[in-house]
Regions:
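Extracellular leucine-rich repeat
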Residues: 2-456
Length: 456
């Protein structure tokens, strides 16, 4: 009996020690280098924000970098966090169940530069300026150093107008995948205070329009993502940031055409991505003319894009800046040899289309050297004529060169007629009407004369 009792006591002690060991292992500590420290608290079923950090954080240098992750836990409320040494602190609460954040939550970490609150259940009412208040000194709340804020994949409809009052250094804001629907007045006021913003992600926010002056205060904006929304045209409001905007992503919108009004004012745009737009059928004349600094164009995965005007790059060919053009996975069959100076490209993508291998394509691929711009293993194939179906377009030869097929051109569209043709048509119709009137007048006069003579 004595031995059994002793055995039970030993077992209890061992269990307590094991549990204590696990309790101390809630977060793992790693030191990538002498100036960096990572506190990994991810996937531990953590339900509450800890009151303090592991002791190892006390030894980080003042100019060190600290990363703290709570990815994929069960935290519902973000309470006030303990202070963390280091000149740059990043914290991730991604993929929790957060529904509330207390005031002064990050007050003890004024060097917080990166905060990820994505994939939670945060509403717009939860996001208040008070949660980003810095240290309280001389009766005034200071600011925190926040540069990147990710609040994507939440339940945000609107932003508090003072939300960014204490984050003057904010340069990257991710609002994607929230049910915003309308950029209301208070949301626009909030954005207007983030004057140092360089990156703005509004993808999949269910918006269909942007007020004209929405971005007029964002004089440093360089990158914006408007994908996955309900835009029928490219928002004209982008012209307000045309001098600074360098990257525009405009995928998955119900736009039917691109034209000379689509990119007005975007003179400094470097990279443009327009893809996965199922309704896009046509790229019209002078569409890309305003893009005088464009280097990379992604015009891909538009299932119904059949036509690109030979003047789509009108005015740019003499001062050509484009280095990479991707036209993959559209519904194109033909391109004009004059569309662009193909030999000036560094990379060209054309795969996944239904190419008619004719004289125009021969000129583009072989004579102008476009065939040397394809990435290895990404060479496009011929779809027609039947004789060349399945062949690489680089195998097109002069021995088989069918007539250029212009069935893609809409010949009945009024815009296709030249002014002189319209003028001659009007004159012709007018002459027919005049002749008809003269004949009618002659017949009536003859009838009156004949009737008068018959009565006499």
């Amino acid at each position: 009996m004595y031995l059994m009792a002793v055995g039970r006591e030993v077992l209890v002690i061992v269990c307590v020690l094991v549990l204590a060991g696990h309790a101390q292992k809630t977060c793992d500590i790693s030191r990538p280098d002498s100036t960096s420290l990572t506190v990994n608290c991810s996937r531990r079923d953590v339900r509450d924000v800890p009151n303090d950090w592991p002791k190892e954080t006390e030894f980080i240098e003042k100019d060190g970098y600290v990363l703290i992750t709570f990815f994929n836990n069960s935290i519902t409320d973000v309470t006030q966090l303990a202070g963390v040494p280091g000149s740059r602190v990043a914290i991730s609460f991604q993929a929790n169940k957060i529904v509330d954040i207390v005031d002064d939550a990050f007050q003890n970490i004024p060097t917080l530069v990166y905060l990820d609150l994505s994939y939670n259940q945060i509403s717009g009412d939860v996001l208040r300026s008070e949660i980003f208040q810095g240290p309280y000194e001389n009766g005034v709340y200071g600011c925190i150093a926040l540069e990147t804020l990710n609040i994507g994949y939440n339940k945000i409809h609107s932003l508090d107008r003072y939300l960014f009052q204490h984050t003057p250094n904010l340069t990257r804001l991710y609002l994607n995948n929230n049910p915003i629907e309308i950029l209301d007045h208070v949301t626009l006021l909030a954005l207007s205070t983030a004057t140092n913003l360089e990156v703005l992600d509004l993808a999949s926010t269910e918006i269909e329009s942007i007020p004209l002056d929405a971005f007029k205060s964002l004089s440093n904006l360089q990158q914006i993502d408007l994908s996955g929304n309900g835009f029928l045209t490219v928002p004209e409001s982008l012209s307000f940031v045309g001098k600074t905007l360098k990257y525009l992503t405009f995928n998955d919108n119900p736009i039917a055409e691109l034209n000379d009004d689509s990119f007005v004012g975007l003179t400094n745009l470097i990279e443009l991505e327009v893809g996965e737009n199922e309704n896009l059928e046509e790229v019209k004349r002078s569409t890309f003319t305003p893009l005088k600094s464009l280097k990379v164009l992604h015009l891909c995965h538009n299932a119904n894009l059949r036509y690109i005007s030979h003047n789509a790059f009108r005015g740019l060919k003499d001062k050509w800046t484009l280095k990479e053009v991707y036209l993959d996975d559209n519904h194109l069959s033909e391109l004009s040899k004059d569309l662009m100076p193909w030999n000036k490209l560094e990379i060209l993508g054309m795969s996944g289309n239904k190419w008619l291998c004719n004289c125009e394509l021969y000129n583009i691929v072989l004579k102008q050297g476009a065939g040397t711009k394809f990435k290895s293993g990404d060479e496009p194939f011929c779809a027609a004529p039947m004789k060349m179906s399945g062949e690489y377009v680089t195998n097109v030869t002069l021995s088989y060169c069918p007539t250029f097929d212009t069935t893609f051109a809409k010949t009945t569209r009024p815009s296709r007629f030249k002014p002189k043709h319209i003028l001659w048509t009007i004159l012709g119709v007018s002459m027919v009407v005049c002749v008809g009137m003269l004949i009618g007048l002659f017949v009536n006069t003859f009838k009156k004369y004949y009737k008068k003579k018959f009565i006499q």
